[in-house]
């Protein structure tokens, strides 16, 4: 089925300047410009995927394709990279827009707050205000999703899926206890080491290493994410990770309560970033919410082997909402 999806479903790659940062956007489906499309055939809804960290949108292409197919190819499925996590190839044109009245560069765009504003800036400039949205946040993308709802409550979001959501106590999680000293205290050692090892490395060697790594991880290589071994992108991912450990502490119950009717939380049973007790706590505090615990032992990084299972869950949950569109 994966090979069929790869052959039949169009995916359009763009590099844009958003908030002053190069950004990769992968658009699943035939629609590439929703903002200026005035035709009657323009879809009424966009499914928008916000990745975890590192925010390599190319990793989510198989998931986006599966979801596009399961929703009967009626709606575009777009995935955005995080600011600073993708650099355009030298032969690739970077698109700009003048539509945003708030088009100034975003302060600290590679940090936690800047990444949230980066996603909001993209929606302002590339998605019509009246277009309905389904937001899908993975890992720290779930935190971004909640913050987007908090900052712009008028966003026309009909559903938001928070997959393996790192929305609280990140530094206290099993992985967080390991990552915190590395990302917060030894970050500059990582920067220098990465730069010294990777900067002199020929592109052909990097490409070979990436291809082998993607094969091992079962990740599709349709859009080769060379940025995996780019020191600039790795440094930005580490910088964002350090802020996650320091700032993602308390769960935003006020925002969750306000938007609970449109939220679906999906927790893992074997997730070292948000352990089962986090699920039990939020389930206790919001018993009426759609808060689910995975029964299939799907790992936090579901994009390595479980794209179809996650797409099935989301498509099934959206059936009633999409039937009204």
Curated annotation (Swiss-Prot):
GO terms for cellular component: endoplasmic reticulum; lipid droplet. Present in macrophage-rich areas in atherosclerotic lesions (at protein level). Expressed in monocytes and monocyte-derived macrophages (at protein level). InterPro entries: AB_hydrolase_fold, LDAH. It is found in: Lipid droplet; Endoplasmic reticulum. It catalyses: a cholesterol ester + H2O = cholesterol + a fatty acid + H(+). Gene3D superfamilies: alpha/beta hydrolase. Its EC number is 3.1.1.13. One of its GO terms (biological process) is lipid storage. Its main location: other. Keywords: Endoplasmic reticulum, Hydrolase, Lipid degradation, Lipid droplet, Lipid metabolism. Pfam families: LIDHydrolase. It comes from the Eukaryota. GO terms for molecular function: sterol ester esterase activity. The active site is at residues 139, 271, 300. Disulfide bonds: none annotated. Belongs to the AB hydrolase superfamily. LDAH family. Probable serine lipid hydrolase associated with lipid droplets. Has low cholesterol esterase activity. Appears to lack triglyceride lipase activity. Involved in cholesterol and triglyceride homeostasis; has opposing effects, stimulating cellular triglyceride accumulation and cellular cholesterol release. Acts antagonistically with PNPLA2/ATGL in regulation of cellular lipid stores. May regulate triglyceride accumulation indirectly through stimulation of PNPLA2/ATGL ubiquitination and proteasomal degradation. Promotes microtubule-dependent lipid droplet fusion. PANTHER family: LIPASE (PTHR13390), LIPID DROPLET-ASSOCIATED HYDROLASE (PTHR13390:SF0). This is Lipid droplet-associated hydrolase. It comes from Homo sapiens.
